[in-house]
Amino acid sequence: VYGEQYYHRFFGLVNYSYNIGKVHVVTLKNINYVGHKKYIEAITDADLDWLKHDLSFVPKGSLVFLNMHAAVWNSTEGEGNVRNAEELADALKDYQVHVLTGHTHYFQNNVMDAQLLEHNIGAACGAWWKSQVNRCGAPNGYLVMDVDGNQLKWHYKSTGHSIDYQMRVYGKGNMLSQPQYVVVNVWDWDPSCKVEWLQDGQAMGEMEKFVDVDEAYAASKGHKEGLTATGHLFRALPSSDAKSITVVFTNHFGEKYEQTVLISNPKVKTQIIAHRGYW
């Protein structure tokens, strides 16, 4: 189409790959214009064949980063996922693959199996241009991939914060839809992670995972109806005489992040007093 021709003219091919150390990096188009200002999220047969041919030169078991625009396996707003995800997964089955996508302005990790993980990464511009958070409540930012040989770690880097900023805690009364709870948004969560809490220094176990609209996002939109909910929220119900709540997030790599809030007066909004980063 016309737009792709212009891209070719000034930048080059839309599909390309290269190696950095032991990592094979692929960029693949998955937005296809169908006319009348409409598009579909799909990988064409020709592009899928190109990917298979490209990977035929890569040793099986290699670490592969696949960059695309639209999400592939999101559970939230899955109607926007790539249509032919099964064919893509089959083409990738012999490799250790991290699929890096955007499009949604929403952060979601999708673990398909031990060898295939999608990071649908929040946008640097947040929920379209004027917001400091994405639609899931994740801060504006980007994902940092640290590679040593074929070993990988990743961390979400929020703009305006250190890389230790990995969660946002809402004290009791600070999330309008959950007034009795302490709530935490852990944007880089996946099922291998843990979100635990302590009340006045006593371990209370894991927090309850639930789905709701993030408070920071809701506030940025005037708490209007119909906002997108997020699945990486967790809550705990403090006792009536609790003085402090500590949240501990253990990430995919066993790194721990801790944040404490005081509950000095149930009529006063909670004050955050500590954010200690790694243990």
Residue ranges and their predicted role:
Residues Y165-Q166, V213-K221, P266-I273:
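Short, surface-exposed linear segments at secondary-structure transitions and domain or protein termini
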Residues V1-K60, E79-L100, Y106-D148, L152-H155:
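Extended active-site neighborhood of metal-dependent phosphoesterases/phosphodiesterases
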Residues L116-D200, G231-L262:
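Binuclear metal-dependent phosphoesterase catalytic core
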